Amino acid sequence: MQTQLAPEYQNTADGQAAEAILRKCVHCGFCTATCPTYQLLGDELDGPRGRIYLMKQVLEGQTPTRATQMHLDRCLTCRNCESTCPSGVDYGHLVDIGRKLVDAKVPRPLGEQAVRWALKEGLPSPLFAPAMKLGQMVRPLLPQSLKNKVPVPQDAGAWPTRQHARKVLMLEGCVQPAMAPNINSATARVLDAAGVQVQVARKAGCCGAVKFHLNDQDGGKAEMRANIDAWWPYVEQGADALVMNASGCGVTVKEYGHILRDDPQYAAKAAHISALTRDLSELLPDLLPVLKTRLDGQAVGAQPALVFHPPCTLQHGQKLKGGVEAHLAALGFVVRIAANEAHLCCGSAGTYSVLNPALSYQLRDRKLGYLAPAANEVIISANIGCITHLQSGTATPVRHWVEVLDAALSATQSGFAA
């Protein structure tokens, strides 16, 4: 796609990056077939090709409007279109640029500004955990719209204390410790059972995704630099990997190298951090032999059958498909994915469920319909946002897959102890 950049964008990093991405687009429209919002709304401007045209017009000097902003806001940034595109259009990076340019020219109403500010400042804040705890205390009194965002409190269980020669770093995340603390401790226990010690850099915080995708890119980059500083001593001490058990964080940290590529102080470190980053499921191939010796077949068989929802940030953002299901099956678990639309977004998409609740809940209900869990099944996923969003629409338990593996290991140990 040929683009004639307006003079104001010709010599800018954003303009040049966007032009290079647009050059790959051949208008084929394959992306519309796998775009969740196009499937719901049937509007060309609510699909990737239409949004690309809107961004192209802005880059060529056309003044954007609130309608332009709305169509870009409706994008989930699920990146399903990237998996479908035969030309390799880097849509995710393009829409980040497009939103930044449009927001610079289209003021948002004060109400929208307030909500977006509260999200980008509140979710990564140390005050989020006590606020969530308070919400959980009064959860029965909350209206359904708020109750959907406040999960039932859970016990995290004990953190392992054994020392191992093999060590990995893990990002705890900003919302996960407050909303689902068992995910991090279950990760530590499972890796401990496989002979791997989990280390946590206490000064590391939000991965930067919330601010970056809410168009506070400078704020997001500041959080990324702070994380690199927190992790670097562990990297120098030889940490094997930087493990992510939330695929939304993982896809962001894997892009630190790209996002900070022009930062003379952090570019090399950011690239190294990205290369070191692994989704938790990427460790499983090496750990399967040890885990098989730690698991009792009866303990695994006593676990419920599993229905796996692969997050978009895992299957499209990180291009990791099929691994979770295959590895769990190799350990003896009964696991399946939805027969239809397993590739489509559940509607969570970070802060999307707050900013676009109507579309988000339509996608959630559609996803739950295709997952169709039976009475004896549990839904599993690999991202805190997907887990809490899906749980808000079903009585079927929704868990992280590592929690199920941890439960089977615990049952095995209890059986041996008995």
Regions found by a protein language model. Give the residues of each.
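Generic structural signal for well-ordered secondary structure
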Residues: C28, L45-R51, T65-T68, R74, ...
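N-terminal glycine-rich anion-binding loops that anchor highly charged ligand groups
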Residues: G29-A33, D43-G47, V198-V200
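Short secondary-structure boundary/capping elements
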Residues: A17, T63-A67, L363
